[in-house]
């Protein structure tokens, strides 16, 4: 396009389309597969956890998101400047995930071993997407560590503990939310494959770490 006049600001066009959709009164919600009866616990309501829930719900799996804070969003809620990300927009996007079927269990840190094991017993899979986790916490959860986070398959997020997956900064330091979201989507595909008895490959072929989709 620049050969004709000026380049287009693609990201601003996407933002405009999203803003118009949210303001429409009936924002877009994707179709979901029939309920599978499978349940997934997600520890962390930041970008990776929210993205994972968005896709897992479309696969028909029930999702409960646990977070230590009183509002979901992670660093998007508590660290990004308001002029960069208005909170009414963020919270409207999160409500879409809730409308899709996600359950939020806020002010609910999962810290001790018994709480973590209870999630493993109650749910068919657990995704850890709680941001950077200290080595001492991994010892409490009895999860293998690898600098700078949980040791997990880089293509799928699968850990050495059956049914436990990890994504985002829980595995490696990620400074861009879009990369955490891409991680969450990949983990969601891997968890779906795990729950449906498929070979676990993640979604690397279809997920861009640059655009998160």
Regions found by a protein language model. Give the residues of each.
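Local cysteine-cluster metal-coordination motifs and their immediate loop/turn environment
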Residues: 1-5
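Beta1-alpha1 glycine-rich phosphate/pyrophosphate-binding loop at the start
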Residues: 7-10, 42-110, 153, 190, ...
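A short, basic/flexible loop-to-alpha-helix module at the beginning of a structural domain
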Residues: 21-40
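Feature captures the FAD/FMN-dependent oxidoreductase FAD-binding
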Residues: 34-35, 39-43, 91-142
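Short, hinge-like loop/turn segments at secondary-structure boundaries
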Residues: 81-85, 123, 145-146
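FAD-site-proximal beta/loop scaffold in flavoenzymes
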Residues: 131-174, 189
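A conserved FAD-binding loop/helix module that cradles the flavin
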Residues: 170-201
């Amino acid at each position: 396009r620049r050969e004709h006049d000026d380049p287009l600001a693609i990201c601003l066009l996407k933002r405009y389309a999203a803003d118009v959709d949210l303001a429409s009164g009936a924002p877009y919600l994707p179709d979901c597969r029939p309920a599978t009866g499978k349940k997934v616990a997600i520890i962390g309501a930041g970008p990776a956890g929210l993205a994972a829930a968005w896709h897992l719900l479309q696969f028909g799996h029930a999702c409960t998101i646990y977070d230590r804070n009183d509002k979901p969003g992670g660093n998007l809620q508590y660290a990004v400047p308001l002029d960069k990300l208005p909170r009414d927009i963020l919270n409207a996007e999160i409500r879409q995930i809730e409308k899709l079927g996600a359950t939020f269990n806020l002010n609910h840190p999962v810290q001790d071993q018994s709480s973590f094991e209870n999630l493993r017993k109650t749910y068919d899979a657990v995704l850890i997407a709680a941001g950077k986790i200290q080595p001492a916490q991994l010892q409490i959860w009895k999860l293998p560590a690898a600098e700078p986070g949980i040791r997990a398959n880089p293509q799928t997020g699968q850990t050495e503990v059956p049914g436990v997956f990890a994504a985002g900064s829980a595995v490696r330091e990620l400074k861009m939310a879009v990369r955490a979201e891409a991680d969450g989507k990949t983990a969601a595909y891997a968890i779906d494959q795990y729950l449906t008895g498929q070979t676990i490959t993640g979604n690397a072929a279809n997920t861009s770490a640059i655009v998160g989709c």
